[in-house]
Amino acid sequence: MISKLSSRKEHLGVVAPSAHADKTAAKRHAVRNAPDVSVELPYKAPYDWGAMLSVFRAHQLPHLESVDDRGYERVVRTSQGMGWFRVAEGAKEHSLQLSVWNGGEEDIANISQSARRMFDLDADPDVVREAMNADPYLFSIWKRHPGLRVTRSWSGFETMLTTILGQVVSVSFGRTLADELMKAGGTKARHPKNGELIHLFPNAEQLLTADLSVVRTSESRRTAIRSLAMLVADGTLEWEHPLPPKELRKTLLGVPGIGAWTAEYVAMRGFHDDDAFPATDYALKQELKRHAEVDVNRVRPWRAYAAIALWKSYAEAKGTPYDPVV
């Protein structure tokens, strides 16, 4: 019985907490180089692929996500256990290529849908450009950078928690805190590509019983994390069928430790709200102070793209890399 159970866990990529990695095990769990399935993800040009990669690179989750100069990779659960996918420039014009390892046709539809959201591939740049035309300064930015898109996330739950952990700390330390959270509550698994032991991002139920004292953040943020986990566990919050915008914000703002910036940012990246605008963001406030004539309400319901444009303008003015996250 123990032998069969252990084999089942290994097939799923899950290992017992007491398991130890070695080189032989790593090789045994590594997946072959060729993907099981690849599909093209078309988009309407223009599209700034480099800008999208730079954002994902800066905020990749330790061990679960990786970004190089040509693409983005992520570990995911598939119908065959633990797998991963990669998004890179496609062979066809105006497309990205999605490749999935250790997965089948039944996985590609779900991963494809998520990837399209993450990389904002269904946005119509002509519609966004027309909206930006309502404000002269925003339109001037958009004319210089017509391929900007809103970077979304794989999971709204991840976005909520990493955003809370990232409050008033550097981006790099925010990633460290995310790693600590994953180790505190996430399931141990074999990385399907290299066989290394990793921790998956914990689900809501795992976080409700996890010891969060090992995460070097404030007690108020730990409380916020538990509160959000409860809202997800009881079905109040979900990202496939999100609450209406006003109700979503009301629910988020009802959690102690979540303010206007967090609620708007989570709505934009985690719940795919094209009209979200984190007005209290430092960079956005600086840009609106420099350009007092700007009225982002002119471009509704596309204010998320106004935020992207202003973040880009701020980076240009400061001579810093583009990164729509503070």
Regions found by a protein language model. Give the residues of each.
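HhH-family (HhH-GPD) DNA N-glycosylase catalytic core used in base-excision repair
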Residues: M1-V326
